[in-house]
Amino acid sequence: MSHPLIPFRANFLRAPRVLSMEIVAPVITTFRGGRLDPELFANHVKNITSKGVDVVFVAGTTGLGPALSLQEKMELTDAATSAARRVIVQVASLNADEAIALAKYAESRGAEAVASLPPYYFPRLSERQIAKYFRDLCSAVSIPVFLYNYPAAVGRDVDARAAKELGCIRGVKDTNESLAHTLAYKRYLPQARVYNGSDSLVFASFAVRLDGVVASSANYLPELLAGIRDAVAAGDIERARSLQFLLDEIVESARHIGYAAAVYELVEIFQGYEAGEPRGPVYPLDPEEKAWLRAAVAKAKSQLRL
């Protein structure tokens, strides 16, 4: 499929702000030689928030959250809250006390909310135990607590009915390829902020007026996501769909060689600066993989005016 040349920067600067449809970036964690680089992280956050990102989501899956120490998560929280106005910190831990400690720290640093995966790894936790984890987290802070629902990673689906039963969830990030699944949270939790977490459903999420999207592509193409949102707001569904298809081409290419590591290279390809590297077990792309990725997205890049 061919796509029109799209001058995103100019369009973004002219377009009206659409506050009800937020772009949330699950920001990458920037490492150099296996060590966290907070300054590089903050500079990356400043760049993407200047180009359409509304909220920064720290220590999520794209940010390699489960592989970070508590101290590293705190350092990222410091860097994020100093660089961005709106920050959500993902606090999940197999140590519930550490999750609560990070949530309290995030609140003290000015984060607007915290989020958490359900307790994972332990396959037979009861619903009562899951509920206690979230209720203890909610009781520990006064800022909103988001459910981060990611069944493919956690092995458990805390669906809309279950989320309502928790009684304290004020937001949801649903990493799910089923838009109907995500929409159900708006039905059962109408006052909650509900985001879908799939790059392939950015257009669809905006079209049905979810509160926003949490899209890893916001790290490397925030302008494209802003273009989709603006097209939906203007009623230009054909344009929005065309932009989604362009995004799909890029994401599918990156998934071919390991998406979590490819995001770092895509930042350099599309934003023009080096964003560090991931850390094992998400290992950096090798030179051959980087060359393959650049060739694979070259056609898509040629159709963007960035």
UniProtKB/Swiss-Prot annotation:
Domain of life: Archaea
Record EC number: 4.1.2.14, 4.1.2.51
SUPFAM superfamilies, sorted: Aldolase
One family name in Pfam for this protein: DHDPS
Catalyzed reactions: 2-dehydro-3-deoxy-6-phospho-D-gluconate = D-glyceraldehyde 3-phosphate + pyruvate; 2-dehydro-3-deoxy-D-gluconate = D-glyceraldehyde + pyruvate
Function: Involved in the degradation of glucose via the Entner-Doudoroff pathway. Catalyzes the reversible cleavage of 2-keto-3-deoxy-6-phosphogluconate (KDPG) and 2-keto-3-deoxygluconate (KDG) forming pyruvate and glyceraldehyde 3-phosphate or glyceraldehyde, respectively. It is not able to use 2-keto-3-deoxy-6-phosphogalactonate (KDPGal) and 2-keto-3-deoxygalactonate (KDGal) as substrate.
Subunit structure: Homotetramer; dimer of dimers.
UniProt-recorded name of the protein: 2-dehydro-3-deoxy-D-gluconate/2-dehydro-3-deoxy-phosphogluconate aldolase
Biological source species: Thermoproteus tenax
Organism lineage string: Archaea, Thermoproteota, Thermoprotei, Thermoproteales, Thermoproteaceae
